[in-house]
Amino acid sequence: MSDVVVRRARFEEVRPLAAEYLAEQEVAFGRPTSPPLPQGGVFWVAEDTASGEIIGYAAGTLRPEGCTIGPIFTRENGRRRGTGAALLSAIETWVADTRVPVMEVAVNAENAGGVAFLRSAGYRPGTMMMVPEEGAPGA
């Protein structure tokens, strides 16, 4: 993890990675999933300290009752080197420091890798989010 630094970011900085995330989700699951909207948005990026390249990001939506984090995304060259863990750790520290009352992390239920990552970090399934079937109104 020492070769990755995490910092808060502006929406404009995460926009390119958000596009990569959506494209990857569409390939993996046959449909894109939407990251949180920028209203009330909080963002973090993970930078490779050697190259300065942004190799991951996390987004969250802040509400009076708490914060929903998701997605936590890393580029291929940021995977299996602690980038996701560094992002999650920075978010957890921020949540504690700012006294956000409730934090939850959203992950696509079909994303086995994402679910396994969060379980290994001490998270468990909680609230279920329902999405319309393909072709249904609102899909």
Model regions: which residues?
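Conserved GNAT acetyl-CoA-binding A-motif
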Residues: 95-107
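Actinobacteria-biased recognition of intrinsically disordered, low-complexity terminal regions
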Residues: 1-3, 138-139
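Active-site acidic-Proline motif in GNAT/NAT acetyltransferases
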Residues: 75-77, 81, 109-110
